[in-house]
A protein has these predicted regions:
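Conserved ATPase "switch" residues in P-loop NTPase domains
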Residues: 8, 33-34, 140
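Single conserved hydrophobic/aromatic residue that forms the stacking wall/gate
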Residues: 1-10
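Conserved sugar-transfer catalytic core signal across GT-A, GT-B, and GT-C glycosyltransferases
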Residues: 5, 28, 150
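Conserved P-loop NTPase
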Residues: 74-164
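Short, conserved clusters of charged catalytic residues that mark active-site
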Residues: 1, 24, 131
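Hydrophobic alpha-helical segments typical of transmembrane helices
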Residues: 5, 51, 135-136
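Outer-membrane beta-barrel domain signature
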Residues: 8, 26-27, 163
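Conserved P-loop NTPase nucleotide-binding/switch module
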Residues: 12-83, 113
Length: 164
């Protein structure tokens, strides 16, 4: 049923898939992207590398290399965001992690080296990339959030220590 519904939306230039939780949805989204559509989706993850891993891990073991290759060939980027209580305690501030689908990033995905994406994000500021910890550090330094909240929302406390 889902693949039939996605077949109908192939007539559109931009496709929004609610959440990619299963192989059928992931496969249909990748096929749409391969045919030139801009496909956007959501996943509940704490970072870009975890997002890539979750997409691949949701697929049958025998299909994971193919999915990894497909994803690497169509990925434009991954944006992770979380809303964090602000320093004043009267609202929230968004912290982000941005991974851009550069040749180096896509090569790491293709080679199953997602654990190295963090270092590519750290060195990729010229193309708009940054890690969540880099953004948390910026928010602390600008007085927008306190250190306690930065540590609570960090996906790698040891790395955050290096930034702060």
């Amino acid at each position: 049923l889902l693949s039939r519904g996605l077949g109908d939306v192939y007539k559109r230039q931009i496709i929004l898939v609610g959440e990619m939780r299963d192989y059928e949805t992931i496969s249909a989204a990748l096929t749409a992207a391969e045919t030139g559509h801009l496909v956007m989706s959501t996943l509940h993850t704490t970072g870009a590398a975890q997002t890539i891993d979750r997409i691949i891990d949701a697929c049958p073991a025998g299909m994971q290399n193919q999915v990894r290759t497909q994803l690497a060939s169509v990925l434009n980027g991954v944006i992770t965001q979380c809303l964090i209580p602000n320093a004043r305690g009267n609202g929230r501030v968004v912290a982000t992690e941005i991974l851009v689908g550069t040749d180096a990033v896509c090569n790491q995905i293709r080679e199953n080296k997602c654990h190295q994406l963090g270092s590519l994000m750290q060195s990729g500021s010229s193309v708009g990339m940054h890690t969540l910890n880099g953004d948390l550090s910026r928010l602390v330094q600008n007085g927008m959030i306190n250190r306690q909240m930065a540590y609570k929302y960090s996906n790698d406390v040891a790395e955050l220590d290096q930034y702060l």
